[in-house]
């Protein structure tokens, strides 16, 4: 069994990766099982080279982590705590952060998806809607009347 696999990014760049690193992705693991020992490059059509390298960096750091136990991992989902290495890893611009989240979702890397989503949750935590809009450059498309109506309908949530 080959110890490395070749992944082809959406922009056509081949990256050679240790098999155990690549198999942090459920999608790639399943593709490798289907392909057998063909040695063919695995196309990753939704992820460009820069993002794929970043994902590989994360997978390399976490290659010895125990596999995710899936949805029954409630304690993991109820907290927004992120370990120090992952916090530093996620200190990227917003576009890259969202690209990493999309790639983790596409590649089925639950732990990386969790870290990305927790990073976004921490960016939102404790902020007003106006501050959140500013953080993510979101245009407010409600009229003042609509905002008042929404506030009245949701008064109970602010108690």
From Swiss-Prot:
Check the record and name the CDD domains matching this protein.
BTB_POZ_SKP1
Name the GO terms of the biological process aspect. Answer: exit from mitosis; G1/S transition of mitotic cell cycle; G2/M transition of mitotic cell cycle; kinetochore assembly; mitotic nuclear membrane biogenesis; negative regulation of cytoplasmic translation; negative regulation of mitotic metaphase/anaphase transition; positive regulation of D-glucose transmembrane transport
Record carries keyword Ligase: no
Q: In which pathway does it act?
A: Protein modification; protein ubiquitination
What is the purpose of this protein?
Essential component of the SCF (SKP1-CUL1-F-box protein) E3 ubiquitin ligase complexes, which mediate the ubiquitination and subsequent proteasomal degradation of target proteins. Controls sulfur metabolite repression, probably by mediating the inactivation or degradation of the metR transcription factor.
Segments carrying the region annotation (Interaction with the F-box domain of F-box proteins) are 101-159
Species for this entry: Aspergillus clavatus (strain ATCC 1007 / CBS 513.65 / DSM 816 / NCTC 3887 / NRRL 1 / QM 1276 / 107)
Family affiliation: Belongs to the SKP1 family.
Question: What is any one of the record's Gene Ontology cellular component terms?
Answer: RAVE complex
GO terms (molecular function) for this protein are: DNA replication origin binding; ubiquitin protein ligase activity
- Keywords, sorted A to Z: Ubl conjugation pathway
Q: Which Gene3D superfamilies match?
A: Potassium Channel Kv1.1, Chain A
Q: What is this protein called?
A: E3 ubiquitin ligase complex SCF subunit sconC
**Quaternary structure and interacting proteins, as annotated:** Component of the SCF (SKP1-CUL1-F-box protein) E3 ubiquitin ligase complexes.
**What's the gene?**
sconC
